[in-house]
């Protein structure tokens, strides 16, 4: 299907809509070195405005869209059409990279395997590391001789060559690029970017890091971008593609009935597959009990969902493996950090203690592991999800939750 002919780009006043946009443009205009970049375009307003800002700042811009899934779905049809239309409006080339095989192997297959093992995987951070940035940087270098990419993520990078001073961190961070939260607290996506490498951070630009979503919409309308009012996806791209996450899981995993039990083994209900549950879940359990119950464990070996009242559901500490220290060197002693254990959860205080890595982590060249001891009990610590460590706005690092414990564990 050919994209419709887009409306031409509106003439844009040299007076940006907000001071934050003016600051973003100034930063892009003063960027050191060669100003050539490939912009990852998903077909949404965020990546569209990122490309527009770079064009206005005088960069030579190439649009790049990854084709991730086959078949009919918003992310592989509407997204491609809108991305092509934006490139027409901005008068920049548009390239589509077939990354379906990589996405299937690195994301879909790993996601299914994780659910089979009773964990709740976090595909977005893995996708950023193993698919999106890896594929864009590799293709742009090979085909376009470009060494920088930009995306519409709400996050910031303090490059080591930037004039502003770097934040003092609890460990060695001299000479490192630092990943920071986006200034819009409601849209900050640094949680999903903790697993990028220093080499990738050196080559990445986030034009929207200091903008709010409202400012992005306002500026996109000022440009007349066709995506300015496009609705934002509220779910994983896989859920959008299949209609729901349940439909995706049903497509790959046959229903397997099992028991819902209390921590003492008492059976209180049945389920059609542990993959449909997650730690901390309270609604939709299908269990009638004298008080609300929360999922506290998924036992893949026994095909059981283990539940408990809230008073018994809190956890004191967890083990985090495959840790990537993105903005600082690995610490050798216990440090105080703020930890985010879910994308939409706020940071909580904890002590981070380095511990010996597993043979599996070492074999995967991810030799860093730690224990997090929380100042207060937590109720949604989920194996498979990421625990990301912060010092104020700076991402120190993060890893995957492997084991959740009580104080006596």
Curated annotation (Swiss-Prot):
Segments for region (Interaction with tRNA): 187-189, 342-343
Record-level Gene Ontology MF annotations: ATP binding; tRNA binding; tRNA-uridine 2-sulfurtransferase activity
Catalytically driven reaction(s): S-sulfanyl-L-cysteinyl-[protein] + uridine(34) in tRNA + AH2 + ATP = 2-thiouridine(34) in tRNA + L-cysteinyl-[protein] + A + AMP + diphosphate + H(+)
Signal peptide per UniProt: none
Annotated InterPro entries: MnmA-like (IPR004506), MnmA-like_C (IPR046885), MnmA-like_central (IPR046884), MnmA-like_central_sf (IPR023382), Rossmann-like_a/b/a_fold (IPR014729)
An example Gene Ontology biological process: tRNA wobble position uridine thiolation
Location(s) in or outside the cell: Cytoplasm
Disulfide feature: 127-237
Site feature location: Interaction with tRNA: 153, 385
Pfam families in the cross-refs: tRNA_Me_trans (PF03054), tRNA_Me_trans_C (PF20258), tRNA_Me_trans_M (PF20259)
PANTHER family, per the entry: MITOCHONDRIAL TRNA-SPECIFIC 2-THIOURIDYLASE 1, TRNA 5-METHYLAMINOMETHYL-2-THIOURIDYLATE -METHYLTRANSFERASE
Family: Belongs to the MnmA/TRMU family.
Primary role: Catalyzes the 2-thiolation of uridine at the wobble position (U34) of tRNA, leading to the formation of s(2)U34.
Protein name: tRNA-specific 2-thiouridylase MnmA
Source organism: Prochlorococcus marinus (strain MIT 9313)
């Amino acid at each position: 299907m050919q994209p419709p002919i887009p409306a031409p780009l509106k003439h844009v006043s040299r007076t940006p809509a907000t001071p934050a946009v003016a600051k973003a443009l100034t930063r892009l205009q003063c960027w050191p070195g060669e100003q050539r970049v490939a912009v990852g375009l998903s077909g949404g307003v965020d990546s569209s405005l990122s490309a527009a800002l770079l064009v206005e700042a005088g960069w030579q811009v190439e649009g790049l869209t990854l084709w991730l899934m086959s078949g009919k779905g918003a992310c592989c049809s509407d997204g491609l059409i809108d991305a092509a239309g934006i490139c027409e409006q901005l008068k920049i080339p548009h390239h589509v990279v077939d990354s379906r095989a990589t996405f299937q192997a690195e994301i879909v297959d790993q996601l299914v395997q994780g659910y089979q093992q009773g964990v709740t995987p976090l595909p977005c951070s893995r996708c950023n590391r193993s698919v999106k940035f890896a594929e864009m940087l590799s293709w742009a270098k090979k085909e376009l001789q470009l060494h920088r990419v930009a995306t519409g993520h709400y996050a910031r990078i303090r490059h080591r060559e930037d004039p502003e001073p770097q934040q003092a961190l609890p460990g060695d961070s001299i000479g490192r690029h630092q990943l920071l939260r986006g200034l819009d607290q409601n849209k900050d996506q640094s949680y999903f970017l903790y697993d990028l490498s220093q080499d990738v951070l050196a080559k990445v630009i986030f034009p929207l890091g200091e903008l709010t979503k409202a400012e992005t919409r306002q500026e996109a309308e000022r440009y007349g971008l066709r995506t300015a009012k496009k609705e934002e996806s509220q779910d994983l791209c896989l859920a959008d593609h299949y209609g729901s996450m349940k439909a995706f899981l049903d497509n790959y995993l046959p229903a397997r009935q099992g028991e819902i039990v209390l921590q003492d083994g008492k059976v209180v209900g049945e389920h059609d597959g542990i993959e449909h549950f997650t730690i901390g879940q309270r609604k939709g359990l299908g269990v009638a009990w004298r008080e609300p119950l929360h999922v506290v464990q998924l036992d893949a070996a026994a095909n059981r969902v283990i539940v408990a009242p809230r008073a018994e559901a809190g956890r004191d500490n967890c083990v985090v493996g495959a840790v990537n220290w993105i903005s600082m060197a690995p610490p050798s002693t216990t440090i105080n950090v703020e930890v985010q254990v879910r994308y939409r959860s706020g940071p909580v205080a904890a002590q981070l203690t380095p511990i010996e890595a597993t043979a599996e982590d070492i074999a995967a060249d991810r030799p860093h592991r730690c224990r997090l001891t929380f100042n207060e009990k937590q109720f949604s610590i989920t194996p498979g999800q990421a625990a990301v460590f912060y010092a104020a706005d700076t991402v120190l690092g993060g890893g995957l939750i492997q084991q959740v414990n009580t104080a006596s564990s």
